[in-house]
């Protein structure tokens, strides 16, 4: 119970300037959140990506359309996420606006704005207004959120509901005894988040455990709290086992082989670097000299040896030659570049990419140092968990610390035990909350300034520049792929399902069920998701030497340029099958 014992110490602030957001502040944040998401939507619309299938959109849309038409929730063998909750929320949207892609993407955009607003509301009661804004901006300005916010992926809706779960849960815990109505609401939102993505269970679990601990410590309303938590637990388990036993469920495989563990370690390291990069505007506020001095003075010899061994192990085992981020969105190339064969254009030149990695390394190292200092502070105090719960009003920070630890532990356990591949979109919830906790911890250790200054806002501007470049280039790529398929269809009259204009186009236009044909190997792995059928045209990145593809062999060429000059040039050629 040590985690529950001292999260207050972990978050203690020498300058208690945090407060609940005022009504005006809430309205301003809501307006800003809507404006930010509006920019994401405008960028996608400018390149034709709004209303086009993006990444796994096609697979989710096939399921929800089938649900709307038949009333049955049937999996296709490709979707691994829980998805049920998002499908149910989508039904009224489809009833009002039709079964097109655009209404569903706009629904997710609404979730994106709500998620930013809720995150601010979660952090603000225990952090200064400026640090809160900077922490949320680390996610909003980065290269990940703006891409998945204009899609039909489950990541953003699950993120938004997890933030709402924490927000309502904090409201329940701040009253003494625990407010049963708010607790029931928080657990309900927790189940809703879990019903979209399995990792969403973390928010409800943290609220449930903390509610029981608080009721036990105060010896008030323990039985009704246990009843609510028990009902939540039964609901989560019933939903999980029901979903796991549906036909065409993605198989769960256990892999603890040396190769699997090595891959897991690489994924964990890359994920840490990705979070470090996105939280770097806060990390730059930390004085490295003060941090090193504090670590030398306050850490025990044992802790210093552990950190030294950790650094040596990292240097000895991490393949720095291939060092990078976890990928999928924040990458040197275009987001989802593997969804079309050929050589994609680079988003960032080599010197800029090296600088990005150095920033990520620095920020991650600073974060590790701060975590070590705060853990040491927790261990020094050694107060009982009962007194810790009873003596502090900083329960929002308690929940957030516990949530971040649990969510990260779930990610680590999943990637260690199973061959699940991590992507940066799985880290959404960790970015703003980790940044906020770093700000709080840095001020508690007196190794950073009390308020963000020019350096931190300049770092945020640099992150936003990287974010806009990635979001814009991704929209250009997705829009170009979709337009390539449309042009080929218009010029040839071929069935759209016989045109391979990339992963999204091909999957969306198939009418046959998913029938995986062995190992999915690139390029064009998406064809192996379905039974063999004639493919009349194939899209790809245009080769740098345009003479490599004779003009007579080109059915269509689509060129899209991003705001920062990245040129996406795609070509479609006949075949591999002959079609009339």
What do the predicted segments below correspond to?
Residues 11, 15, 67, 124-130, ...:
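Membrane-interface transmembrane helices that cradle and orient dolichyl/undecaprenyl
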Residues 33, 188, 230-233, 301-314, ...:
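Signature aromatic-anchored transmembrane alpha helix within multi-pass, membrane-resident enzymes
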Residues 45-55, 68-103, 196, 507:
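Membrane-proximal lumenal/periplasmic loop motifs of glycosylation machinery
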Residues 106-127, 164-168:
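Transmembrane-helix motifs of polytopic, lipid-linked glycan transferases
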Residues 135-137, 163, 168, 181-197, ...:
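Membrane-interface alpha helices of multi-pass inner-membrane proteins
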Residues 150-158, 199, 423:
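Short acidic/glycine- and proline-prone juxtamembrane loop motifs at membrane-interface regions
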Residues 169, 334-348, 421, 456-541:
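Membrane-embedded, lumen/periplasm-facing catalytic core of multi-pass transferases
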């Amino acid at each position: 119970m040590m985690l529950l014992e001292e999260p207050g110490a972990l978050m203690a602030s020498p300058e208690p300037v945090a407060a609940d957001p005022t009504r005006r502040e809430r309205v301003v944040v809501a307006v800003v959140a809507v404006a930010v998401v509006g920019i994401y939507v405008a960028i996608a619309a400018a390149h034709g990506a709004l209303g086009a299938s993006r990444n796994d959109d096609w697979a989710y849309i096939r399921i929800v359309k089938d649900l709307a038409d038949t009333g049955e929730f049937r999996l296709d063998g490709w979707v691994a996420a829980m998805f049920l909750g998002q499908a149910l929320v989508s039904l009224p949207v489809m009833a009002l606006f039709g079964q097109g892609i655009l209404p569903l993407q706009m629904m997710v955009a609404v979730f994106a704005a709500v998620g930013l607003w809720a995150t601010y509301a979660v952090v603000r009661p225990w952090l200064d207004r400026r640090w809160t804004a900077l922490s949320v901006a680390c996610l909003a300005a980065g290269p990940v959120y703006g891409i998945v916010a204009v899609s039909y992926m489950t990541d953003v809706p699950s993120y938004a509901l997890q933030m709402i779960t924490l927000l309502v849960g904090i409201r329940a815990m701040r009253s003494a005894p625990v407010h049963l109505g708010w607790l029931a609401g928080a657990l309900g939102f927790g189940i809703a988040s879990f019903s979209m993505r399995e990792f969403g269970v973390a928010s409800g679990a943290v609220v449930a455990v903390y509610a029981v601990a608080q009721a036990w410590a105060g010896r008030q309303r323990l039985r009704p709290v246990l009843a609510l938590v028990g009902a939540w637990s039964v609901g989560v388990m019933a939903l999980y086992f029901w979903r796991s036993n549906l036909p065409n469920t993605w198989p769960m495989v256990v892999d603890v082989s040396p190769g699997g563990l090595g891959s897991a370690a690489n994924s964990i390291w890359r994920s840490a670097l990705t979070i470090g990069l996105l939280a770097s505007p806060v990390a730059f506020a930390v004085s490295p000299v003060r941090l090193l001095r504090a670590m030398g003075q306050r850490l025990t010899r044992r802790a210093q040896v552990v950190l030294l061994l950790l650094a040596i192990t990292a240097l000895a085992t991490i393949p720095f030659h291939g060092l990078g981020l976890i990928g999928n969105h924040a990458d040197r190339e275009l987001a989802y570049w593997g969804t079309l064969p050929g050589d994609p254009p680079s988003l960032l030149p080599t010197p800029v990419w090296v600088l990005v990695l150095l920033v990520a390394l620095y920020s991650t190292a600073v974060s590790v140092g701060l975590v070590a200092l705060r853990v040491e502070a927790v261990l020094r105090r050694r107060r009982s968990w009962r007194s810790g719960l009873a003596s502090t009003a900083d329960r929002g920070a308690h929940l957030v610390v516990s949530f971040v630890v649990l969510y990260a532990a779930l990610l680590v356990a999943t990637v260690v035990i199973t061959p699940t591949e991590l992507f940066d979109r799985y880290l959404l919830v960790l970015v703003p909350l980790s940044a906020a906790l770093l700000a709080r911890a840095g001020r508690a250790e007196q190794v950073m300034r009390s308020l963000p200054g020019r350096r931190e806002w300049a770092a945020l501007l640099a992150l936003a520049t990287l974010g806009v470049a990635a979001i814009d280039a991704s929209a250009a790529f997705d829009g170009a792929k979709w337009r390539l398929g449309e042009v080929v269809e218009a010029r040839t009259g071929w069935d759209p399902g016989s045109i391979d204009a990339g992963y999204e186009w091909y999957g969306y236009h198939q009418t046959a069920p998913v029938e995986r044909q062995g190992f999915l190997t690139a390029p064009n792995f998406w064809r192996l998701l379905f039974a063999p059928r004639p493919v009349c045209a194939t899209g790809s990145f245009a080769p740098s030497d345009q003479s490599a593809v004779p003009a007579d062999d080109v059915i269509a060429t689509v060129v899209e340029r991003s705001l920062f000059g990245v040129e996406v040039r795609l070509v479609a050629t006949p075949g591999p099958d002959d079609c009339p």
